[in-house]
């Protein structure tokens, strides 16, 4: 089965994905195999429904938000390259990557890109700030009915009050980064991919 995956990916495509995402040859081959097993329509793309069949996403309270991150605006299918680009945000940063070429593009799994990815999970209307309502929606997704609306409102208000530095009653990306400056985002937003 692994050989099927490697034969369908051209060497040049494999090299481009490797360069763009930082995944190893064997990781790309393994993830391609996973991609094709999820591709129920066998058309080389995944739909939202394909993602919803992944048990870990189905039970994750933010599963729908994570699934949405795989799709470009207005798109309802994602190809293998787009799939890999999104997964690259969750690739752990290796020691040898910390001293990468400063003139090259920033790796998709950099702290900055991981923070942008996390910010987009909260910024539901894509206006580059997290409003009280957006924060409430995400909190509601995470805790369900276990906490009253009043308590959730209090948590949202306190969070915005602590993070909002410019007084606009919302959290900008800069404010989001400031709040998370002491959080090990690189570790918390990483998934170990087998080599």
Curated annotation (Swiss-Prot):
UniProt cross-references to CDD domains, sorted A to Z: EFh (cd00051)
Binding site for Ca(2+) 2: 164, 166, 168, 175
Motif (Nuclear export signal 2): 176-185
Location relative to the cell: Nucleus; Cytoplasm; Cytoplasm, Cytoskeleton; Endomembrane system
Keywords attached to this entry: Calcium, Cell membrane, Cytoplasm, Cytoskeleton, Endoplasmic reticulum, Lipoprotein, Membrane, Metal-binding, Myristate, Nucleus, Phosphoprotein, Protein kinase inhibitor, Protein transport, Repeat, Transport
Membrane topology according to the record: Lipid-anchor
Organs and tissues of expression: Expressed in liver and kidney (at protein level). Ubiquitously expressed. Expressed in the brain, lung, testes, kidney, spleen and heart.
UniProt: Ca(2+) 1 binding residues: 123, 125, 127, 129, 134
Subunit-structure text: Interacts with PPP3CA. Interacts with SLC9A1/NHE1 (via the juxtamembrane region of the cytoplasmic C-terminal domain); the interaction occurs at the plasma membrane in a calcium-dependent manner and at a domain that is critical for growth factor stimulation of the exchanger. Monomer. Interacts with STK17B; the interaction occurs in a calcium-independent manner and induces the translocation of CHP1 from the Golgi to the nucleus. Interacts with GAPDH; the interaction is direct, occurs in a N-myristoylation-dependent manner and facilitates the ability of CHP1 to bind microtubules.
Protein name, UniProt field: Calcineurin B homologous protein 1
Species assigned in the record: Rattus norvegicus (Rat)
Gene behind the chain: Chp1
């Amino acid at each position: 089965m692994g050989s099927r995956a490697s034969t369908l990916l051209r060497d040049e495509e494999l090299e481009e994905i490797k360069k763009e995402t930082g995944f190893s040859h064997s990781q790309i081959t393994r993830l391609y195999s996973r991609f094709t097993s999820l591709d129920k329509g066998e058309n080389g793309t995944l739909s939202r429904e394909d993602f919803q069949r992944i048990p870990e996403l189905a039970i994750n309270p933010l599963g729908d938000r994570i699934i949405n991150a795989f799709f470009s605006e207005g798109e309802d299918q994602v190809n293998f390259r787009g799939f890999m680009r999104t997964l690259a945000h969750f690739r752990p940063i290796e020691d040898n990557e910390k001293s990468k070429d400063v003139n090259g593009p920033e790796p998709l799994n950099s702290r900055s890109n991981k923070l942008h990815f996390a910010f987009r999970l909260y910024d539901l209307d894509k206006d580059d700030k997290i409003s009280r309502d957006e924060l409430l929606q995400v909190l509601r997704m995470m805790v369900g009915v276990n906490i009253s609306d009043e308590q959730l409102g209090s948590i949202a208000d306190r969070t915005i009050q602590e993070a909002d530095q410019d007084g606009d009653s919302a959290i900008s990306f800069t404010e989001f980064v400031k709040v998370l400056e002491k959080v090990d985002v690189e570790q918390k937003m990483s998934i170990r991919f087998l080599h």
